Amino acid sequence: MENNDIQFTSLQMRTDKYGWASIQYANKKQAILYTRNGGVEWDVVNPLNSIVLFAYPINARSSWAYGLTKTNDDLLPAIFYTVNRGERWSEFILPVEEDWEKSTDVQVQLHATNMDSIWIVLSRKLASNKFEHNLYYLKTKGKVWKVIKNISISDSISGITFINDLIGFISLQKHYETSTVFKTINGGESWHPIKDIPSLEGINNGTTMAYKAIYKNNLLVIPTKMNDDIFLMNYSFDKGNSWHISNETINTSKVAVSFFSSYYGWVINSENGGVYQIIKKGAKWIKVSSNPLLKNVFCLHFFNRRKGWACNKKEIFTTKDRGITWKKVVYKINNIDKLV
């Protein structure tokens, strides 16, 4: 199998040496990759006897993954977890009740900040073009599950983020007549649209996408792409009770976003390779470079104030000077035939 047959779906380096990536093969099979030498070599570290659908790294050693586990000739939805760089995985079987949740076609969103608990949303598109979503919450100690069936959102979910056990946010891709963000204050039991998120004057109704909310040190950020190909950010400093709109916007239809902390963030305009550093808790955007190498990047992850990584479907790039200069990483994937 050649690298030409695969494409990256995510990349998260956690140190100079160690990091995770996800790839998809032409036959739609997916794999979790791990590197120990700065992205030069990658190993396939999928859980045994599984079909992986979504990976969610936590740190240099630990990661969650969602997929189907093969049990007695049956495929059961499961959450997998590793604390030793993918060498061994353990699993929890989801308490699903509906057949569609056991499919590889299910849409998946995950959120976790540690290895103690995780949120899972399973979604499907109905014939009416609306969506059905089931929410699962797992506390690993005691294997405690909370299940909320058919939550009251009918649009396509682009991300879920919880800032504590009770307060969470779901971001949507939808027609911009009502809110693109929903909030819960009771652990997901009920969800309500946030109606006071500011927008730009003169924006026409159309399809708007709110990206997965980012929460860093009491700064809550919701990156948003308007239908007129205008990218902006909404900020909250009080857990989503009040909101502010970014002073800056970018005219683009494609971006990659990363926040290392509440004080340092980055945006790449994936149409032209422009790199912006965000400081002062979102108040100031500084264009630090423009690099055609970065056209079409969709994943971006900074693990400190200076060092970051980005990828497009085929290539990996890294910076050591807060995004001013970027270098392409020549890589190889070992045992890639495991995907067949």
Can you name each region flagged by the protein language model?
Residues M1-V340:
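Extracellular glycan-interacting surfaces
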